[in-house]
């Protein structure tokens, strides 16, 4: 398990033009995928959550006991299958691709491509979503009732069963409210401690839970659950719960925080004035033109067109029925290109075909 933040450029794929399609990456993906993708076998046949990880252009299933745990060096595809009407047998889908902050452009492109492939496999019924580490949508976070856990490195390092006596220290930060608890690994430095949150210092056979004086009950409870799970995996490990103000500076918890800090690049997304853009392909090239700003409602959308609705904290691509035949991958790419020109390039992207269910979109056009 990696202990410090990886030195590679974070969100390196962000500045890519995502020119995956027709590229060597696409050819490699198609070659590995062949006629059918074996990972999709059985996908979408019953309600529930399925997760896959991208490994060398291939889609590999992510174990159910690892659901909610992601590594920042990896990319994942998440499929949620549900019944909009409990009285009906009809199934609906949301398919997300999640990109870690240290994920490569190839992984980003492969995840995006494979998400479109899964959409096609499910007869174009899913709503597609792009999720970026630290900027996940509320819909995505709500899948994981125990909260999201983001760890350093790739899953390859995570699956090595390191003996506790050889374990490299790590500091886990628990933040959020109610069901929206976010757990992520941070540098081993005292400056990262926040009185409003809870932390776990994992030293292998010694575990400390540090409760900030202003932390919430939900954060403390989540950390306690996490600590219990760690102890079940390491029966010989000893755990101690520490309170912020009553723990002396000489305590091993503090003296163990000897790492090097790294800048925290995650900045909260902020709701901004709505911006509605129309996508056209005049001259054979996709381009966007602003239609309006401010309040947007259903009457602003036409079945013969494609629109981007940018709310600052989210980006929606609405595809009219008359444009379904156009390659869906293009809609992810055009929204990615649009966001690159804004101050919120990592906002969640939702691709919605006319008539599909998307609660966040309905809220956005009703505001």
UniProtKB/Swiss-Prot annotation:
InterPro entries: ADF-H/Gelsolin-like_dom_sf (IPR029006), Gelsolin-like_dom (IPR007123), Gelsolin-like_dom_sf (IPR036180), Villin/Gelsolin (IPR007122). Gelsolin-like repeats lie at residues 56-141, 179-225, 287-322. Residues 186-295 are annotated as: Actin binding, Actin-severing. Keywords: Actin capping, Actin-binding, Calcium, Cytoplasm, Cytoskeleton, Developmental protein, Repeat. Residues 106-109 are annotated as: Actin-actin interfilament contact point. Pfam families: Gelsolin (PF00626). Calcium-regulated protein that binds to the plus (or barbed) ends of actin monomers or filaments, preventing monomer exchange (end-blocking or capping). Can promote the assembly of monomers into filaments (nucleation) as well as sever existing filaments. This is Gelsolin-like protein 1.
């Amino acid at each position: 398990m990696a202990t410090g933040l990886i030195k590679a450029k974070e969100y390196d794929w962000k500045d890519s033009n995502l020119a995956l399609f027709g590229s060597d990456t696409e050819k490699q993906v198609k070659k590995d995928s062949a006629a059918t993708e074996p990972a999709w076998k059985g996908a979408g046949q019953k309600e529930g959550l399925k997760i896959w990880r991208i490994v060398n252009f291939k889609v590999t299933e992510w174990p159910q006991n690892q659901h909610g745990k992601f590594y920042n060096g990896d990319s994942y595809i998440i499929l949620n299958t549900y019944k909009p009407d409990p009285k009906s047998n009809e199934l609906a889908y949301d398919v997300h691709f999640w990109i870690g902050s240290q994920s490569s452009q190839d992984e980003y492109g492969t995840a995006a491509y494979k998400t479109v492939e899964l959409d096609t496999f499910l007869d174009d019924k899913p709503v597609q979503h792009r999720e970026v580490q630290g900027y996940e949508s509320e819909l995505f976070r709500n899948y994981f009732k125990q909260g999201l856990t983001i760890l350093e490195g790739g899953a390859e390092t995570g699956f090595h069963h390191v003996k506790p006596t050889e374990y490299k220290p790590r500091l886990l930060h628990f933040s959020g409210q109610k069901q929206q608890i976010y757990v992520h690994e941070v540098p081993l430095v005292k400056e990262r401690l926040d009185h409003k949150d809870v932390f776990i210092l994992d030293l292998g056979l010694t575990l400390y839970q540090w409760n900030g004086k202003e932390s919430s009950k939900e954060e403390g409870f989540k950390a306690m659950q996490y600590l219990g799970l760690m102890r079940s995996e390491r029966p010989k490990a000893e755990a101690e719960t520490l309170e912020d103000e009553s723990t002396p500076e000489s305590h091993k918890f503090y003296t163990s925080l000897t790492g090097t800090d790294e800048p925290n690049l995650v900045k909260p997304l902020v709701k901004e004035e709505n911006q509605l853009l129309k996508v056209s392909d005049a001259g054979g090239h996709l381009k966007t033109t602003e239609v309006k700003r401010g309040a947007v409602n259903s009457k602003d959308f036409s079945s013969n067109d494609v629109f981007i609705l940018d709310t600052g904290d989210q980006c929606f691509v609405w595809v009219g029925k008359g444009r379904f035949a156009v390659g869906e991958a293009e809609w992810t790419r055009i929204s990615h290109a649009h966001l690159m020109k804004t101050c919120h390039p990592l906002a969640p992207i939702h691709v919605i075909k006319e008539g599909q269910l998307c609660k966040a979109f309905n809220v956005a056009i009703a505001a």
